[in-house]
């Protein structure tokens, strides 16, 4: 388990058996920092370096959510896909994709911030009430040069 600072926020990763099982943003560090390769990878990412975050993970999710998140994990750094594109690839509805993305236990590691709506950016679920999800999504996309 480790926390990485990003401006006024912290990105926290829970590891079990060498795999990430949960990640989340907070306004305080949940864990100590780490000099692990995974922490260094995230530090580089949050400093604006073009880094594909490659942290092994274990998903605790339904088979449908797992399929959606596997599709989301293929979206490259600096790119976005619409909910409708993912829905078409998986033969389902954009709304169902949105619900699965909302349940992503591993934001950034599985880059759900790269999924957007046709007319607007779409939401971004965060577990900390002090953080506005939509603003955080925009900030992550700006970091990757999308905006």
From Swiss-Prot:
The entry lists its GO molecular-function terms as: methylated-DNA-[protein]-cysteine S-methyltransferase activity
| Segments crossing the lipid bilayer | none
Catalysed conversion reaction? a 6-O-methyl-2'-deoxyguanosine in DNA + L-cysteinyl-[protein] = S-methyl-L-cysteinyl-[protein] + a 2'-deoxyguanosine in DNA; a 4-O-methyl-thymidine in DNA + L-cysteinyl-[protein] = a thymidine in DNA + S-methyl-L-cysteinyl-[protein]
PROSITE patterns, per database record: MGMT
Per the UniProt entry, the Enzyme Commission number(s) are: 2.1.1.63
Which catalytic residues are annotated? 112
Question: Which SUPFAM superfamilies does the entry mention?
Answer: Methylated DNA-protein cysteine methyltransferase, C-terminal domain
A Pfam family for this UniProt protein? DNA_binding_1
Q: Where in the cell is it found?
A: Cytoplasm
Keywords annotated in UniProt: Cytoplasm, DNA damage, DNA repair, Methyltransferase, Transferase
Any further remark recorded for this protein: This enzyme catalyzes only one turnover and therefore is not strictly catalytic. According to one definition, an enzyme is a biocatalyst that acts repeatedly and over many reaction cycles.
Role this protein plays: Involved in the cellular defense against the biological effects of O6-methylguanine (O6-MeG) and O4-methylthymine (O4-MeT) in DNA. Repairs the methylated nucleobase in DNA by stoichiometrically transferring the methyl group to a cysteine residue in the enzyme. This is a suicide reaction: the enzyme is irreversibly inactivated.
In the record, the note on similarity to other proteins reads: Belongs to the MGMT family.
Q: Which PANTHER family does the record match to this protein?
A: METHYLATED-DNA--PROTEIN-CYSTEINE METHYLTRANSFERASE (PTHR10815:SF13)
Q: What is this protein called?
A: Methylated-DNA--protein-cysteine methyltransferase
- Organism, as annotated: Archaeoglobus fulgidus (strain ATCC 49558 / DSM 4304 / JCM 9628 / NBRC 100126 / VC-16)
| Organism ancestry | Archaea, Methanobacteriati, Methanobacteriota, Archaeoglobi, Archaeoglobales
């Amino acid at each position: 388990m480790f926390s990485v600072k990003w401006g006024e926020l912290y990105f926290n990763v829970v590891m079990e058996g060498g795999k990430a099982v949960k990640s989340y943003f907070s306004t305080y560090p949940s864990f100590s920092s780490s000099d692990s390769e995974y922490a260094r990878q995230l530090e580089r990412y949050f400093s604006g370096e073009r880094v594909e975050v490659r942290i092994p993970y274990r998903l605790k999710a339904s088979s449908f959510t797992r399929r959606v998140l596997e599709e989301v994990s293929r979206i490259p750094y600096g790119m976005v896909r619409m909910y409708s594109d993912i829905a078409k690839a998986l033969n389902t509805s954009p709304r169902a994709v949105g619900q699965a993305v909302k349940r992503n236990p591993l934001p950034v590691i599985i880059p759900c911030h790269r999924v957007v709506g046709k007319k607007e950016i779409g939401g971004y679920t965060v577990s900390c009430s002090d953080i506005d999800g939509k603003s955080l999504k925009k900030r992550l996309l700006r970091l990757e040069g999308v905006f």
